[in-house]
From Swiss-Prot:
Note: Heme 1 (or BL or b562) is low-potential and absorbs at about 562 nm, and heme 2 (or BH or b566) is high-potential and absorbs at about 566 nm.
UniProt-annotated location(s): Mitochondrion inner membrane
Subunit composition and interactions: The cytochrome bc1 complex contains 11 subunits: 3 respiratory subunits (MT-CYB, CYC1 and UQCRFS1), 2 core proteins (UQCRC1 and UQCRC2) and 6 low-molecular weight proteins (UQCRH/QCR6, UQCRB/QCR7, UQCRQ/QCR8, UQCR10/QCR9, UQCR11/QCR10 and a cleavage product of UQCRFS1). This cytochrome bc1 complex then forms a dimer.
Sites where the protein binds heme b b562: 83, 182
Protein name: Cytochrome b
Keywords: Electron transport, Heme, Iron, Membrane, Metal-binding, Mitochondrion, Mitochondrion inner membrane, Respiratory chain, Transmembrane, Transmembrane helix, Transport, Ubiquinone
Database matches in PROSITE patterns: CYTB_CTER, CYTB_NTER
Source taxon at top rank: Eukaryota
Any GO MF annotation of the entry: metal ion binding
InterPro entries (alphabetical): Cyt_b/b6_C (IPR005798), Cyt_b/b6_C_sf (IPR036150), Cyt_b/b6_N (IPR005797), Cytb/b6-like_sf (IPR027387), Cytochrome_b (IPR030689), Cytochrome_b_C_euk/bac (IPR048260), Cytochrome_b_N_euk/bac (IPR048259), Di-haem_cyt_TM (IPR016174)
Record family assignment: Belongs to the cytochrome b family.
Length: 381
């Protein structure tokens, strides 16, 4: 008798993806973040669904409905903070996942990488429209500032902004449509995740050595199911510590003040996970230039496969590029710090230097390091 999981049309797909999947025997914990992202997405959709049951997307009642969720709904405070801090954990896992992809050369799996970039952009869009929903001061002014950036687009900019707003300012129509977007996008993300996995399983996973691992594969279950389970437990533990002890540490105090179009907050700063991009945006004095730099800060990821000239897969045996990579990570952390600082000296100057460094490292330094390493290899061949 044949095993049902190998013959049943539906279960067979799950079997080939999570049970009998041939996996490299040496993939490290850096490969855990894919499954952690899946868990984050499920947590966000579940908590989001329960929040949507009590939330009202009307400017008059949105802020009050969030207060009502926290005060009157059974465990509403828990659901709300799980959703808010779950988003932060989601982005931390996302950035580590992308960072691992850059370090180990996973961008050479072109289709998987490109779908991943689209996923990153879609997730950022989802988080942005979600941040507007509580209708606090930072929600309102964040929405105003970021949507206003589109007015920098020549010729159609102003019309486009008013079209997105559904009026001449961020108002009731904007909030309603942002709620609609925030509800539908996670399901689109889920569909794209399946495509992401489909392309990944076409080629198989990369591994830390960067060598072909066809001769040394092990089944995904039980080895990596349990390894993933450990990662999930650690993720949930960190998330629960965050939610139960420091629920507001990543939030903004201004968002506990209801939205007021007549009063601008002293410093408009986005959520913790967008600060690096916000710093790049602010570092360019020209509006259109800033918007283009903001877009390029993410889209430049698509250039990695094109800029790669190394004879080796990944940075495991490439010490020079490793040094540049870690300088790049440090630079990214500096940008994150600058994004949360006021627009004044010396922060503006540091931001400009860090922004130039961000693009210089990717476009110039990494390819040069690859060429040097290739020449060293030739000398010792």
């Amino acid at each position: 008798m044949t095993i049902m999981r190998k013959t049943h049309p539906l279960i067979k797909i799950i079997n080939h993806s999570f049970i009998d999947l041939p996996t490299p025997s040496n993939i490290s914990s850096w490969w855990n973040f894919g499954s952690l992202l899946g868990i984050c997405l499920m947590v966000q959709i579940t908590t989001g669904l329960f929040l949507a049951m009590h939330y009202t997307s009307d400017t008059a009642t949105a802020f009050s409905s969030v207060t009502h969720i926290c005060r009157d709904v059974n465990y509403g405070w828990l659901i709300r903070y799980l959703h808010a801090n779950g988003a932060s954990m989601f982005f931390i896992c996302l950035f580590i996942h992308v960072g691992r992809g850059i370090y180990y050369g996973s961008y050479m799996l072109n289709e998987t990488w490109n779908i991943g970039i689209i996923l990153l952009l879609t997730t950022m869009a989802t988080a942005f429209v979600g941040y507007v929903l509580p209708w606090g001061q930072m929600s309102f002014w964040g929405a105003t500032v970021i949507t206003n950036l589109l007015s920098a687009i020549p010729y159609i900019g102003t019309t486009l902004v008013e079209w997105i707003w559904g009026g001449f300012s961020v108002d009731k129509a904007t909030l309603t449509r942002f709620f609609a977007f925030h509800f539908i996008l996670p399901f689109i993300i889920t569909a794209m995740v399946l495509v992401h996995l489909l392309f990944l399983h076409e080629t198989g996973s990369n591994n830390p050595s960067g060598l072909n691992s066809d001769s040394d594969k092990i089944p995904f279950h039980p080895y990596y199911t349990f390894k993933d389970l450990l990662g999930i437990l650690l993720l949930l533990m960190v998330l629960m510590i965050l939610v139960l002890f420091f629920p507001d540490v990543l939030g903004d105090p201004d968002n506990y003040t209801p939205a007021n179009p007549l009063n601008t907050p002293a410093h408009i700063x986005p959520x913790x996970y967008f600060l690096f991009a916000y710093a790049i945006l602010r570092s360019i004095p020209n509006k259109l230039g800033g918007v283009l730099a903001l877009l390029l800060s993410i889209l430049i990821l698509a250039a990695f496969p094109l800029l790669n000239s190394s004879k080796q897969h990944g940075l495991t045996y490439r010490p020079l590029t490793q040094i540049i990579y870690w300088i790049f990570i440090a630079n990214l952390l500096i940008l994150t710090w600058i994004g949360g600082q006021p627009v004044e000296y010396p922060f503006t100057t540091i931001g400009q230097i860090a922004s130039i460094s961000y693009f210089t490292i990717i476009i110039i330094l990494m390819p040069i390091a690859s060429m040097i390493e290739n020449n060293i290899l030739k000398l010792h061949a």
